[in-house]
Amino acid sequence: MINSFRLLKDRKSKKGFSLLEILLVLGAIAALIVAAFMIFPKVQASQRIDRESRNLTAIQAGVKSLYGGRAKISSINTDSFIASKNAPENMIQDGKLINEWKGNVQVEYSGNHGKYNIIYDAVPASDCSKLIAAVSGNFVSIDVYNGNGGTQVKNLEEGKNIDIAATSAACFSEDNSTIIFASVI
């Protein structure tokens, strides 16, 4: 027993980390980095959709604030909307309305019964159907235009509620989409 105690006492303790321990830590760090790069784009896309759905709601509220109670809204356009200070400030860049994907946003009269359009340019295919699904309840009609042509995915005036399959098909394109959201005052 004394000999075994002396052997333990004489033995010098090793300082530092072994190669195996270092490789284990590096492997764990690499796994965390890979996981972060897989999750981060999804979180970013979700945040873009959330911001744009809030922007669309703010544009609608601004138009209603500006033109609510008026029988005639034919003077509505993007420039007058921005000048009225009803446009979301986070969208105004160089006197234009710009969306999260750096596309133009236009507000215009659609020509009938107090109806106006909010036009979103440069919406990527990966976010197109998600944006439409997030805000479809706020609009009477929604149209998607891209390299595949144009598709109406909702028209309450014709009794056509949102068609998710048609939305996915319309948004599936190598080109960015232009989405026209129609609303009524």
Sequence positions of predicted segments:
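N-terminal leader/signal peptides at the extreme start of proteins
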Residues: 1-15
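Short, flexible active-site loop motifs that bind/organize anionic cofactors or intermediates
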Residues: 12, 39, 118-121
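Short, contiguous, pocket-lining structural segments
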Residues: 12-15, 24-32, 48-55
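C-terminal juxtamembrane segment of a hydrophobic transmembrane alpha-helix
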Residues: 20-22, 29-46
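Short, charged/polar micro-motifs that form catalytic or ligand-binding hotspots
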Residues: 22, 46-49, 117-121
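Membrane-proximal N-terminal amphipathic helix
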Residues: 41-83
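Periplasmic/extracellular, small/polar-rich flexible segments of pilin-like filament-forming proteins
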Residues: 68-185
